[in-house]
Amino acid sequence: MGQILSNPIIDKEHHSGTDCLTAFGLCAMQGWRMSMEDAHIVEPNLLAESDEEHLAFYGIFDGHGGSSVAEFCGSKMISILKKQESFKSGMLEQCLIDTFLATDVELLKDEKLKDDHSGCTATVILVSQLKKLLICANSGDSRTVLSTGGNSKAMSFDHKPTLLSEKSRIVAADGFVEMDRVNGNLALSRAIGDFEFKSNTKLGPHEQVVTCVPDIICHNLNYDEDEFVILACDGIWDCLTSQECVDLVHYGISQGNMTLSDISSRIVDVCCSPTTEGSGIGCDNMSISIVALLKENESESQWFERMRSKNYNIQTSFVQRRKSIFDFHDFSDDDNEVFAITTKKLQDRLNRSKDNDDMEIDDLDTELGSSATPSKLSGEDRTGPIDLFSLEALLEAGIQIRQRPSSDSDGNTSYFHGASLSDMLASLSNAAAGETEPNDADDNDDNDGEENGKNENAKKGSKIEEIE
């Protein structure tokens, strides 16, 4: 399961936005893990407003062995996509394959990242207004699900080493599957990065032990039936089936007072383990994006009204689902206490009286492009030697991290990721306590990778296309 904290970091990134094609609400939380290794993209329109076409692009990237590759994907993938000739030619399916391959190539060109040992999953969607088309590209075990008529439809499938098609490629490339892991190490069979598993110079990118080449699934949009898309990392899918997640979104919509950001946040609450006991599910980083599919000239509020008018009979609630997932835990009869681990005030979570060592936590929803500031310690500013008790309090309670959207040289400001303040504090605390740096940062998908000397820019990829 990897190393975990004594208390989860519960401060959440919230992002939301809308235009004429889609609306979205995203929530990401570090949770029980020692660091945040997820990243994401939310871009309602890739093109200029004057263009005839309108393309929305969303993505979730779940890192393992570190956050570097996931962060690179989040900050660079849009600019990489726009440079592809297939994108300029309107070949949307091929451009996603080309983009994944080119991202691996660009990683190897980066002096700071070419020797990095991390990798990440990638599940992304393009929504085309002109073609009325939803396209999903997926590598790894993050997942994309479409809600259509209240039912879940898989827009991706998890790439696990035990799948016959994946195992055949692994073995043909002189790899092996042991304990359901690639070479006994990596728990997924496709990923961006992870160059240790892509070092066979005699094979193309699509033939390597681990490949970044995505599967492509296309869906012709019917706006009377197709409602929203969910993209999430395995921290969510380890706890919920696709249908259960769709049902929870519909349940949130039916409440009448929840935004998409609110619903995504509550789903994270549902999936965060109340304790580190049990099987380990609910102790991972969590990221989820809910993308509403808007009809022509439909506003987000009108979309909500249309969804509620469908009157689905949802036989679940956030509380019921949480209790079902963690049935080993003795929850309070008070439903307000069911989500205590992610909602309780700091002083309650630490079981301490209010004093100057407490830290006020808020959880504001920030729109795209808005600025935010870190939470501050209450009381007077502190100087002098490190107060280990205060550090432990910060680590156990979580730290509110706020950032402006990052911007790269291409002007892409759609990518956000958590700051590393918690990592710094953990390092300071361990150093002061005489502890050594953890030597095993493994994830459910952890592995180390090495630079691959060559990565051919092949155009091959699996494709599953629905014929409607």
UniProtKB/Swiss-Prot annotation:
Region of interest (Disordered), residue spans: 354-383, 427-468
Cofactor binding note from Swiss-Prot or TrEMBL: Binds 2 magnesium or manganese ions per subunit.
Residues that hold Mn(2+) 2 according to the record: 62, 234, 284
Catalytic activity reported: O-phospho-L-seryl-[protein] + H2O = L-seryl-[protein] + phosphate; O-phospho-L-threonyl-[protein] + H2O = L-threonyl-[protein] + phosphate
Record-annotated PPM-type phosphatase domain positions: 23-293
Residues annotated as binding Mn(2+) 1: 62-63
GO cellular component: cytoplasm; nucleus
Keywords: Cytoplasm, Hydrolase, Magnesium, Manganese, Metal-binding, Nucleus, Phosphoprotein, Protein phosphatase
Matching InterPro entries: PP2C, PP2C_BS, PPM-type-like_dom_sf, PPM-type_phosphatase-like_dom
Biased composition (Basic and acidic residues): 451-468
Compartments where found: Cytoplasm; Nucleus
Primary enzyme class: hydrolase
EC code: 3.1.3.16
MF terms (GO), sorted A to Z: metal ion binding; protein serine/threonine phosphatase activity
GO annotation (BP), single: signal transduction
Cofactor needs: Mg(2+); Mn(2+)
Pfam families: PP2C (PF00481)
Biased composition (Acidic residues): 357-366, 437-450
Free-text function comment from the UniProt entry: Dephosphorylating regulator for many key proteins. Dephosphorylates the cell cycle master regulator CDC28/cyclin-dependent kinase 1; its activity appears redundant with phosphatase PTC2. Dephosphorylates HOG1 at 'Thr-171', to attenuate activation of the stress-activated p38MAPK cascade; its activity appears redundant with phosphatase PTC2.
Extra information: Present with 19700 molecules/cell in log phase SD medium.
UniProt record similarity statement: Belongs to the PP2C family.
Subunit note: Interacts with the ATG17-ATG29-ATG31 and ATG1-ATG13 supercomplex; to regulate induction of autophagy.
Protein name, as recorded: Protein phosphatase 2C homolog 3
Organism of provenance: Saccharomyces cerevisiae (strain ATCC 204508 / S288c)
